Amino acid sequence: MGDFFLDAYFDCDPHLNEPSVETGKTAYQVVRTRRQAGAAGTVVANLAALGCHQIDTIGYIGNDGEGFELKRALTGLGADTSHLIVDEGRVTPTYGKPCLVETAKTRAWQVTEELERLDIKNRRPTPARLQTRLIDAAHRCLSAADAVVVVDQVSEPNCGVITTRVRRSIEELAKRHPDKPFVADSRKRIGQFRQVSIKPNLGEAQAALSTSSGRSVAAAGDLLKRLRGRRLRPCFCTLSTRGMVVDDGSGLKHVAAFSVSGPTDPVGAGDSATSVLAIVLGAGGTATEAALTANLVASITVQQIGTTGTATRRQVLQRYQEVDARES
């Protein structure tokens, strides 16, 4: 449940650049377009790649071309979009991503640079009637769910799916169902979530507590402990190449990342981690097991350049075997 974005990639061949007659600026020549489900859609892509059989999507899109493409992308992943509300008064949130690609034979369609992004977002508050429909959808879907993922992507307060009212409704559902995992990820408001597991990165944790404390693992652990407070659910703080800190109420634990070689692209790594945490917790795993598996998946997705990566169960098992052999 949350903010579903369309990731619209425009791959441009720099060898075909032309000067614009009207402005004299560079007219980039698009040689390929790609449409993917982003933000909460990236979570869906990861859940699908890891073999989840029933994925309900709760959010809204506009009655526009971007909404059509986003819904098609989600359907292509096998997700149920019957609770993805089409609203005439909203636009479909979209990240337009022009990229330079190298099309030489040795590097066919390899992304070499991502240019300035173009954002389409709703900057007016989400109407009350739409919030009511979103809350009703959450109530309908909950009974059949093994876990709930909440993605609060929109920075502008109360302009996305996870408004204050919707967040409080989710918290009430989580309070009523303490045995069902709820995992929340928020770009700007992670400190406002109660009753659910949270997964900030270090910068988000610092912002939530209005502090610029150090970047050490110990400092991150202290931040997470303060954020968890009286929450009864496990909480996580991601540390990029240093892995993740976990607070499950029995003490802080640092779960190290798995090292990778070669170029990496962190786009979507946080969403993949959120997906895995929900899967493992929903299957009855411990918080530490969830963090370890999330780090394992992240070591795969960050090696997928110029796209929001995913990992299959086979890839995860293979990576685990590689790591196990290396450490034996």
What spans do the regions from the language model cover?
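Short glycine/threonine-rich catalytic loop with a Thr-x-Gly-x-Asp
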Residues: 259-277
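Acyl-CoA/ACP chain-elongation machinery
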Residues: 301
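Ribokinase/PfkB-type carbohydrate-kinase core domain
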Residues: 1-18, 25, 29-254, 258-262, ...
